């Protein structure tokens, strides 16, 4: 009995902060999504906010942009991180540490510093990207990467990718260290090709890490906000607006808290569904 009380005593602070700062806001957000909640009114409107949301062309545009970011970033992050980790793992300790530092640097660098660097790279007049492309005769005139609706979302996605691969690479390198080397050597002695060794031995061992990386990258892509706020503010013409940015715009710029919470509920449901699908697809073969 005493041990149970002590256990609950240690858990109490964590549970308190979880209830106050996570669970309660989630419940309140869901409840207020059924209200016309702003600085001047608090009126129950039922499903009107949800009906308005699905008829809102800006919401539709933001949803499409969000889906593009998720589909474009998750597979690339997983495959690129796996490739780099597999190449890095076989290097010596010094080279491995250097590559870890290089790829993890954007992760620990503040988002403001990252956006300042990329803003200079993308600058239409003095940016290094336009300079390199023009010098290589790939383009004939400067491109406004963040100001052109045809290029802005791709430019954001590239930044998102560069800041998302650091942690997965480190995780994959660590996971590769846990692969049973005797199984790999035995398979090679039996005449297995490198692809067979990877697919039959290494890949099953890397599945738990892959599942974690896929889910975390998906959530981060759905919640992409800081880059967009600092670089494009959702423009031009909402071409880079995501659900997270549109939620912020409605809540903190237009003070339409009820409608913003409706978008938040939809976003949470989308993340839950996609994560569940990923878990079912990748998790069935995971051995813990």
Question: Where are the regions that the model predicts?
Answer:
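A structural signal for multi-pass alpha-helical bundles of membrane permease subunits
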Residues: 3-288
């Amino acid at each position: 009995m005493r041990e149970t009380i002590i256990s609950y005593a240690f858990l109490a602070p964590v549970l308190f902060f979880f209830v106050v700062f996570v669970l309660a806001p989630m419940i309140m957000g869901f409840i207020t999504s059924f209200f016309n909640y702003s600085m001047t009114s608090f009126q129950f409107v039922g499903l009107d906010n949800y009906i308005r949301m699905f008829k809102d062309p800006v919401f539709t545009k933001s949803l499409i942009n969000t889906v593009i970011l998720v589909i474009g970033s998750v597979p690339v992050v997983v495959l690129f991180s796996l490739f780099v980790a597999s190449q890095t793992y076989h290097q010596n300790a010094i080279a491995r540490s250097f590559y870890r530092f290089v790829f993890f640097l954007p992760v620990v660098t503040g988002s403001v510093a990252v956006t300042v660097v990329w803003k200079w790279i993308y600058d239409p007049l003095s940016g290094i990207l336009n300079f390199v492309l023009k010098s290589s005769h790939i383009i004939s005139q400067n491109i406004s990467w963040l100001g052109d609706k045809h290029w802005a979302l791709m430019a954001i996605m590239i930044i998102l990718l560069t800041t998302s691969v650091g942690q997965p690479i480190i995780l994959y390198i660590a996971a590769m260290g846990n692969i049973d080397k005797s199984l790999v050597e035995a398979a090679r002695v039996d005449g297995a090709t490198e692809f067979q060794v990877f697919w039959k031995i290494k890949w099953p061992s890397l599945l738990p890490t892959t599942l974690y990386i896929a889910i975390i990258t998906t959530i981060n892509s759905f919640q992409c906000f800081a880059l967009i706020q600092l670089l494009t503010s959702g423009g031009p013409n909402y071409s880079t607006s995501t659900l997270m940015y549109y939620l912020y715009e409605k809540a903190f710029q237009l003070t339409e808290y009820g409608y913003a919470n409706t978008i938040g509920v939809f976003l949470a449901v989308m993340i839950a569904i996609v994560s569940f699908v990923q878990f079912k697809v990748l998790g069935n073969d995971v051995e813990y």
